[in-house]
Amino acid sequence: SKLYANLYKELMVSFPVMSDICIQNFNSFSALFDNIRYVSEENYDEFCIVNKENSKRRAISSFFVHLMKEGVIEASKIGNIIVNLCDKFIEYISKEGMKNQVDEICENLFILIKNGIETIETDGSLDDVHDQITSFVENVITFKTKDYKSFTSKTLFKFMDLEEFC
């Protein structure tokens, strides 16, 4: 994604329409997290489609965070997406039957935070956002899976891995 982001930035210089396309796609990025689906392996064809959707969502997260690092997307916009996903995560962990959605949000948070927290931290105007993100990660690693209906050990360990980047 880093290579693609670099290439895309160069294409934007030669083809200004690429900038408009980037903005349109970025503006619809948050909506990708409104319809996270889960299908059991029993329906294999649909299961494969959902896995592709998840892979695409993660690739787009990586692409946009690398565009931020290239200066194409403002750090505040990625910061806002991270904060919104943190809120969605907290909302979902208390609901029954949301383990897969929580895991998918966690995977994307991992990508966005791991690759973007340094850029957010160096932007002096985003101290509050940086503090909010790091506090969120520090809090999540204290959670107990038994206290939340849709919080798995897999998600907890992913956040423990993420702590080293915050």
Regions found by a protein language model. Give the residues of each.
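Alpha-helical interaction scaffolds
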Residues: 1-166
